[in-house]
Amino acid sequence: LTMEFYRRNYIEGLFLSSGVLKSPNYTMELLYTVLYKLRHEHNFQGYIHVKAIPGADSRLIQMTGYLADRMSVNIELPTAESLRLLAPHKTRKNILAPMRFVQQMSAENQYEIQTYRHVPKFVPAGQSTQMIIGATPESDYQILHVAESLYKKFDLKRVFYSAFIPVNEDKNLPSVKEQRPPLLREHRLYQADFLMRFYGFKAGELLSEDNQSFND
């Protein structure tokens, strides 16, 4: 399907993601296999953004990174506390580990490219992440500080924000009946993120302890 769309110029690239099937290594190997076939068997030259699976062997992530343009590890929620509340099977440490590995591999690859000829590129478009907003009580101020820290510590190219959309009732989640997706809030965070990435604004210059929300 991807190659049919690509040949007809319907698409210029592919975003490939997956939930964990059987195990992180099994899932990461499946993602690698898809990318390998696209690049080497079908000569796909388009843009590929692939997800790295937390808990997968670093060798699998490395092999996949040489076939992708961008790689992402979703941080899921703004804080470790929220992650423990809503996704206790996941840990912040487990999520940040592949993010750090991709950063280190990218830095090493940049050095190799400058030193040697014909070195394959590792995720040349960098890495990104995504966090869900509105499912937990963090303020815009807290969320921007998390994003700012991720940009600094992991050399991220983008942080994506996804407005929480309730689909079922859960005592730990906002009510399906009362909660609307915070789309305006998502939009404001993207605007603030743009100011931080392109104009060098700090989170503390956009919001403060006394004013923690863009909608107040």
Predicted segments with their positions:
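Generic secondary-structure boundary/loop-capping signal
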Residues: 80-83, 161, 193
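Intrinsically disordered or highly flexible coil/loop and linker segments, enriched in small
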Residues: 11, 108, 156, 198-205
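Conserved Radical SAM active-site core
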Residues: 1-129, 134-137, 150, 168-178
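Flexible, glycine/charged-enriched surface loops at secondary-structure junctions
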Residues: 111-117, 161, 201-208
